Amino acid sequence: MVTKKNSRSPWAWIPTLYFAEGLPNVIVTALSVVMYMQLGLTDAEVGLYTGWLALPWVIKPLWSPFIDLLKTKRWWVLTMQALIGAALAGIAFSLPTAFWFQATMCFFFLIAFCSATHDISADGFYMIELDEHTQTKFVGLRNTFYRLAIIFVNGFLVMLAGVLQVLFRNQIRFSWALIFYGLAGIFIGLWLYHSRFMPRPKDDVQTDRTVGEVAHELKNMFRTFFVKFGLGETVCVMLFLLLYRFPEALLNTMTKTFILRPNSQGGLGLSPQEYGFANGTVGLIGLLLGGILGGILVSRDGMKKWLWPLVCAITLPDVVYIYLSYSLNSNLIVV
């Protein structure tokens, strides 16, 4: 297997690169929720503060065109991985302090920004390093290792945090500090590995365009989009993109606190170990199977036929959570 410019096998760097891409995303959006809840924040505080952490991924298209103005994509990938590793260590160091909340929020924001930039650079590097045929061939591998990162954090690490809390007699901060020390070590290891094994494509060069030229191109792109489709169609497209996964987005953060809160506080009262198994392992397997089935149906009959059934399918979990909120059924098999 060869790339466009190098003889180095994509198997040497694609799995680890996309595992590294998935880790910080789920650490910031999922692991932080569980940690803050266990450290005493209310549901309202958890929802407010962790909700803001997703902002860098929302607005990353605004700075993605400017990445090539400074250094290469490979440089950005390695630099962001090093910064993420340092920020994870910063979270671990700051957890035992009196200002742990302010410090960890700053580090989580840094991780979110670095992760969004890493996504841009890693995807760009993938496209310039591999020819179109090889890109298509490795799409499945990319997605697999990205999902494995989600399983690792949502499944294994949450369960490990629960086990550590039992071993260290409910020392919650110390247990979470150990988790983040471990994550910092993993990311520093990934950074060192990629420094050695990521190829150096000849096409990965710093652009000679200026900031003004890139900003002008970005402005023209938005203008062309609105002129081509018209204001009415553009508004409809934007509303569709906003609302299609809106029910899922509403559930994303608060389901974690709902599952972990005790029955006396309106939750299901699962332990971190049970949560990790139910949500991070079994739930993700269901997500993968659903994605495969949806892909088969769409490829066979087209998106037009299955669009509204899929809209209903993505809203179905809301009904399940309504049932669980009324019944407060803590049976792990039911959950």
Q: Can you name each region flagged by the protein language model?
A:
Residues 19, 50-55, 82, 109, ...:
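Transmembrane alpha-helical cores of Major Facilitator Superfamily
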Residues 78-99, 312-333:
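C-terminal ends and interior cores of transmembrane alpha-helices
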